[in-house]
Amino acid sequence: MPIFGQDDFDTEVLLEGCQLAGLQVIEYTPRRADANSVIPTLRGRFPEAVIVAGSTIDDENVIRQMQQKFPQLMSIAQLAPFVDGFVSMLPYSDATLQAYSPTHLCIPTAQTGGEALRQVGKGAAFIKVLGPDFSFSKNLHATPTFGYCPTYITGGVTRERMPEAFAAGNVLCAAGFDVVLKGENPETITPERVAALLCAFVESAKAARAAVNPQLSRLEELTDEEFLAVLPNYCSVI
């Protein structure tokens, strides 16, 4: 999953590249200054894709104050009509998970096992873990946890590190365009080049995940019942 964060690349070039690549999911964050104008348009541009808002904060008082400095910030309530899910580098409260998990994918961060268990139990679809170190992922997937926790990892997950990321137990990974397009010139890159590099990332991720969880390599062919049966983790989205 590509993450629209803060970088020097042109938004329109990146969006066109995502369209050419036929991506099934994208994450757009308010770290990008145009987020409050772009996020409401994404469903129209990507009608078949899952649209996720990243870098969310589930405290409206904090959002209101920080909007003075970062006017592109939107609360979860403001984002909800335009997206299919939310990601955060922070935990979510029980109230947020109970309010939004029935209708949206909720992917908060945890930094302890207890924090992860609480949030999954309240409806989190995945727990976000922060790379590039995989120690916490491995702890969450240790034998005594019975592999309950579905984890999504970001941060330094290059194509070369994907096998290690999935071997640590993660079932999803994402990267910002600073990683996906590393070494590319923002002034000259084309949508076609963006699409080619995105497709290479997607194929590397699929291959790395299939090596660890081969039962997940043909998800589009499974019924809902078969899908739930092959998942390696607990599923709160039922």
Give the positions of each predicted feature.
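Conserved N-terminal beta1-alpha1 strand-loop-helix module at the mouth
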Residues: 1-65, 159, 188-206, 225-238
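Catalytic beta/alpha-barrel core
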Residues: 2-4, 24-33, 50-58, 65-92, ...
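Short, well-ordered alpha-helical microsegments
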Residues: 11, 35-39, 93-97, 113-117, ...
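Acidic (Asp/Glu)-rich catalytic clusters
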Residues: 13-20, 36-47, 76-81, 98-101, ...
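Surface-exposed amphipathic alpha-helices with a cationic face
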Residues: 19, 39-46, 93-103, 120, ...
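Catalytic cores of alpha/beta
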Residues: 60-81, 114-123, 139, 157-173, ...
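Glycine-rich phosphate-binding active-site loops on the catalytic face of alpha/beta enzymes
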Residues: 79-95, 129-138, 169-197
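C-terminal helical cap(s) of enzyme catalytic domains, especially alpha/beta-barrels
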Residues: 97-105, 146, 166, 181-237
